[in-house]
């Protein structure tokens, strides 16, 4: 029994040991399998992530290759989607196969878990401990290295500070030695000048005082400063504070000093200050140190608005100072520069521009397979005329342009089925990077012809950041056309993520500036407002450095409206290798020659000939006098008002275009300003109440109706007084294949017959330009004519070329130069008096009234001339006596009417005129009346000006020069503000 029980216990013990071992082995296996499972899952996640990246890269590579080869250009959208689906399906199947292989591999690893022993656990534990120890050791090493680096940096910084401190001490010691050497070389100063600073505060200190002050500076570490004030005595302070030897009395020492010393001297100086200023340099001589140092304001105790400030009124200037003799005309030209002149030119040779791509066009096979005869026939069908070398062939469908899918989808949503004639030819040319001139009738889709290539051009360049200028710049003549182009661009730019900003006058400039500062790819603008923006804040708002695509819409109208200087200056500031596009409904020869200066080997496109009215417009021309036009207009309104909108062109604008376009009213009465770019839906009738003054204006007026394939009607009233406009109307009707009324043809033929006979003169085209150019050539011609006239009268040296009537400082009491000229004229014709006795009578003022003076008998020939000379001499002598009786004084004028309002207010205010009058000794008064720009004063009236009068010529010149300086400062401040100088800017519509 005992043996059995022992054997049983032994077996139980063995079973327990065996079970313990099995449990330990099982736990170890589970832990190892769990670790391996985590490692395999991590590997699976990494592999899946790598597969995703590779699939995305392959997908992008596929899209890039397909775009580069142009495989999807000739196929439809369904084929591209089907190929893309097949490719993605194969990729998904490949990824599923790789996942299945990974699962099988995991199963095999789990089946090997029973074969592992406990020794593996021990090895794993030891390995983990070694790894942890090595990691802790690496952390300690890194921490020690970081601390050492910080200590080294602190040591270097301390050494650098010590070096700088030593340099400062050496510099201070060297400066002190130089000052001592200068004082010793000068020797002791004799004499002392009294000033308002007090007796103890001399103008020049003694050597002992300077030494004491210097010692004080050194004791205080070189940081003490000398502070000088008007009523403060110099006090030397020791390092320990020193004792003050000043006792307070019942009377304040400062009050006693002011009452006894300062106030009497101030009264004396106030009596002589004006005389002292006026006598300074008046006699042309200076004495003592003042001849070298100039006028000392502090010596007089007068400091006006801050001493030694450039903006204050300085001492009177000598006669030789060129600023006093500046011509008023040159001053006005310098101060009142236009915004175009203030925009400085850019030297492109000093700027490294980044290269950009122009050519995006790849001709599809359908177009390249066409023969030249087929291309010519297609252009003839579209009524296209092309001038240029290697012109790309016109396209037939939108997908042949090479535009992105987003643009094509937008075209499909807008129901643009196929390109219009101007678009079919312009898109390949502009997409090829060529400069282009597009001439097409109104409503033919010119806007889309330059907008679509611009979007593709912009997407190829790096994105715009804040502070960068635009990439595409579109200029138009009127704000209505700018708004219309902006709305057309917004239809496509929204899908592409491109920002467009309109810049035009008549609206708040603050919002436009904020949008430009944020960065924009496209700017649609009028030339005048764009110049304003570029000049504001010295060009910090935006710039033209990134502009590579320039568009001028209605270019002929911009040149005709006088925007040529602004356009030229803007174009000159854009990089020379830009792409330039010009579009318009009309393009006269004069403007074409001017426009080609800004283009580089352009291709010209014409649709339907040059300046032709759309054939879809029914044109009626009626001969009606002024009295019958209004009743006829009422008949037309009663007939057409219910059919749609009506536009009436007259010489004055009565209604607003915004109400007309927003269906507030169906009738708009406007001038030719509305004839350009105005696109109003459902506009059925156009009435020319007043006949247009040239052919191009008629084409644009009539072109407001019949747009985008719609029908329209145009009625024009003309009378016998408007016969000079009849030939243009007949020409427009004939070119557009419309019937010409017999009475209109008769009026036109009658007028042309009068022109051939020389009775009448044909009017201009409206694009020749008129008025003054205000350039240097015109100034030279005017000065040459003035000089020739003076030479003819024998007074060539009397005045210089730069002098103007208003710039001359003249003596008061009249000028006898006119009488001298009269005498010269009489003497010049004395020799020929017998042949032409009447000539002298015509030259004298008041019709030769001198010959009928009492006591002078009317004679003929030389006797009559001698009598006239004697009478003129008597008048001259009397005028001289009268002038001598009046005290001598001088006067001058300065016109301020055309300056900005702020400048006029400043220069006429008593706070400005008072100090100038007191300082110069001249009297300044405001005369004349303010006239707005464009208004002409009457015969007895004058524009606003300042009248300066003084006892000496130098006083008048000095006062006038100071007034000019004030005007210039305020004018420049006004121009530097956004939208400043409202009175001097051009009208931007």
UniProtKB/Swiss-Prot annotation:
Binding site for ATP: 440-447
InterPro entries hit by this protein: DEAD/DEAH_box_helicase_dom (IPR011545), Helicase_ATP-bd (IPR014001), Helicase_C-like (IPR001650), P-loop_NTPase (IPR027417), PRP5/DDX46/KHDC4_KH (IPR056149), RNA-helicase_DEAD-box_CS (IPR000629), RNA_helicase_DEAD_Q_motif (IPR014014)
Span of domain Helicase C-terminal: 590-748
SS bonds (residue pairs): none
Residues bearing the modification Phosphoserine: 119, 200
A Pfam cross-reference name: Helicase_C
Keywords: ATP-binding, Coiled coil, Helicase, Hydrolase, Nucleotide-binding, Phosphoprotein, RNA-binding
Family the UniProt entry places it in: Belongs to the DEAD box helicase family. DDX46/PRP5 subfamily.
PANTHER family to which the protein is assigned, alphabetical: ATP-DEPENDENT RNA HELICASE DBP3
Protein name: DEAD-box ATP-dependent RNA helicase 45
Organism: Arabidopsis thaliana (Mouse-ear cress)
Phylogenetic lineage: Eukaryota, Viridiplantae, Streptophyta, Embryophyta, Tracheophyta
